[in-house]
Amino acid sequence: MVLFTDLQSQNGGHCQPLLYLKSIPVAQFELGTFDYLNTLIASHAIPCDWKVVGGVHPIKTRALLIAVKERLQRIATRDPALAAKVQILESHEELKQLRVEGAMGAIYQPNAAKCWPYKLVAWILERLVRDDARAATGEKLFNLQTSTSALGLQRLEDGYWIVHTSRGQITTKQVLLATNAYTSYLLPRMTGLIVPVRGQVSALVTPDKGEQLQHSYAWLDNEGGEDYLIHRDNGPLILGGERLVADGAEVGVSRDDAVDAAVAESLRRALYGTLKLKEPDQEEDDELAADFEWTGIMGYSKDDSPWVGAVPESLGGGGGLWISAGYTGHGMPVAARTGISVAQMMMGREKQEGAVAVPEEYKISETRIRNLEGKAERTLVEELKMLDRP
């Protein structure tokens, strides 16, 4: 088996299931992935700064607040335990305690964590290399090839695949594409189904007399914008988002070797008037200094759901080609278990007891592909109203 992956560096270390913004099966899957990561990291003492802190979603408008309340009522009728994991806070004292006094209200979810994603991935890769070297048989099963570009795929008549790379060719029965934003380079027929979108993150210097934030934050607006924030313990504020201020909102941008100046400035100013960083009697800074600014390329799915499973011939696949990609900037509470699920499919173990089943929305089908033709964009309020409707 050959795995090709896009390890993108934009990730800001914000892991939180969107329990009220997804269908119930998807919310349950994301919560399961969060619990899986929490257990994995704790059981192996993985040094990746993982800390469960609870997540706050400030709500800016009355219309969005009403839509969220109605959505939670519908969830409660079908899955009361899931609905109980989401709290709506509206009182001035509650919002002040969360440092978002100017908000119309706020969502609080205890199931949210911050971490250093690179450290987590590096630990896993190091463990795979180490365990492979210690294998009793002496046979190497894991081969890590970094800085090796996949240039093309070729299917042979006997069912094998040839992967053309910058270092030669590989012939294999099965290929897994974890290529996310760059999927259409190898599968041109998926152009438009997964689109590259550049995200930008800043490590902002905690201001003088700034206090340690106790929670992570995410701001979602009706126009499709999303900002997300974690505060490293005794370190910088890691803020990502603000891409809507860039020309074209960074949609279709696949280069991560530059930062957008307008986005960078907006990130430095974004928290002013939005989040209280200092002690109550201290005046806030209208702009923060940035120690580091960087970008990474996200894979946005046309219907906001990942693509997981066997790639059909209509998309350039056939027997032996698999995919897990298209996380729409929300891979942290998703990708770990979609990866497990597709690996089980490849080994024919998807029906065994304990196998990880992905939601129907993630599965690849001709019906899903057809339904995306001419799909209209929806606002966040419209999306909330549509979820779980009969």
Regions found by a protein language model. Give the residues of each.
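Active-site lid/adjacent beta-loop-alpha segment flanking the redox-cofactor pocket in flavoenzymes
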Residues: 189, 193, 210-320
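N-terminal Rossmann-like FAD-binding beta1-loop-alpha1 element of flavoenzymes
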Residues: 1
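Rossmann-like flavin
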Residues: 22-127
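C-terminal lid/capping helical subdomain adjacent to the catalytic/cofactor pocket in oxidative enzymes
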Residues: 148, 157, 161, 304-307, ...
